[in-house]
Amino acid sequence: MIAMSASKAGYKTHLYCPKGDNPAEVVADKITHGEWDDYNKLVEFSNDVFCATCEFENIPSKSLELLSNKTNVVPSSIVFRCAQIRSKEKEMAIKSGFNTPKWFLIKNTDDLISSIKNIAKEGILKTNSLGYDGKGQLKVDKDSNFFEAWENLGSVECVLEEKLEFRREISLMYFKSLDDTEGFFPLSENYHENGILKKTSAPAYL
């Protein structure tokens, strides 16, 4: 989506990605195929671009830090690192004054047992990292086998969130340019099916 929008705006785009089914390749002006941790290819890529960004957040933080030493990475590698860890996202939101659903960090079976007691009815068990758009998460309730659900997610570090019923979901996107110009894009509304984003409409109709 970023490459398509950039192309329409007249920018030249250079895509870095592993080989595979990459939709952006049809609009990119240049393509470099490489693994996310191929540091030599990342350096070559960085030498050819003025600014680098990511279509999704789960790029290894070390790779983004390497790029940030060679070219402009936006948002910064610090922001991406926070977005990769669900518990860090929630802690940042709370620190910034936002409310979050009740949630618990699960590192071991003791954490899991303790958190179950504090969930009212339904919850969502999510991997703390590498989850994306409905992946790495399972719905659970008081009758669920929480240990089986945790095992199905690989018994990795997770967060358990209390499930809330939403009437609507809206997003407000903030931007900051390299010259420190700041602003907001129009308010948008998101529509999900089974935890996966299906459509976003902007501006939102409130």
Where are the predicted features?
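Internal nucleotide-binding/catalytic subdomain
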Residues: 136, 140-206
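A generic structural signal for alpha->beta connector loops
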Residues: 10, 28, 70-71, 97-100, ...
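ATP-binding N-terminal substructure of ATP-dependent carboxylate-amine bond-forming enzymes
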Residues: 1-84, 88, 110
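Short glycine-rich anion-binding loops that position phosphate/pyrophosphate groups of nucleotides
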Residues: 57-59, 129-130, 175
